[in-house]
Amino acid sequence: MIQPRSILEVADNSGAKRVQCIRVLGGSNRKYASLGDVIIVSVKEALPDSNIKKGSVAKAVIVRLRRSVRRNDGSYIRFDQNAVVLVNNQLEPIGTRIFGPVARELRWKEFTKIVSLAPEVI
């Protein structure tokens, strides 16, 4: 469950390293986001020579979540960190590589480009 002011790691090579959630998209009063949801983030740490600068605002898709998420078959999935992939306004990833595993829920939510770039889908 990601809410505004949550700090997240960035799982791609866009240049940002750490971001902070500033808004959960999908409703006027939505409080929490889960796997595969789109949020608006502010970049808190970035590499010095990247296109993404510290303080810039971007959209991101949640790919890993520390909170246990129940799947339709009754199993639960949980990761060691909260991580996002930065996307543009067309919801395509900004980076060209994705680091670490991503959840299978992204395929169900039509983020096939992120799933195809990921080294492992759990």
From Swiss-Prot:
The answer to whether keyword Ribosomal protein applies is: yes
Cystine bridges = none
Its Gene Ontology molecular function terms? large ribosomal subunit rRNA binding; structural constituent of ribosome
What are the UniProt keywords, alphabetically?
A: Ribonucleoprotein, Ribosomal protein, RNA-binding, rRNA-binding
Matching entries from SUPFAM superfamilies are given as: Ribosomal protein L14
Under Gene3D superfamilies, the record lists: Ribosomal protein L14 (2.40.150.20)
Listed GO CC annotations: cytosolic large ribosomal subunit
**What HAMAP family does the entry give?**
Ribosomal_uL14
Subunit and interaction comment: Part of the 50S ribosomal subunit. Forms a cluster with proteins L3 and L19. In the 70S ribosome, L14 and L19 interact and together make contacts with the 16S rRNA in bridges B5 and B8.
Protein name, UniProt field? Large ribosomal subunit protein uL14
Protein's gene = rplN
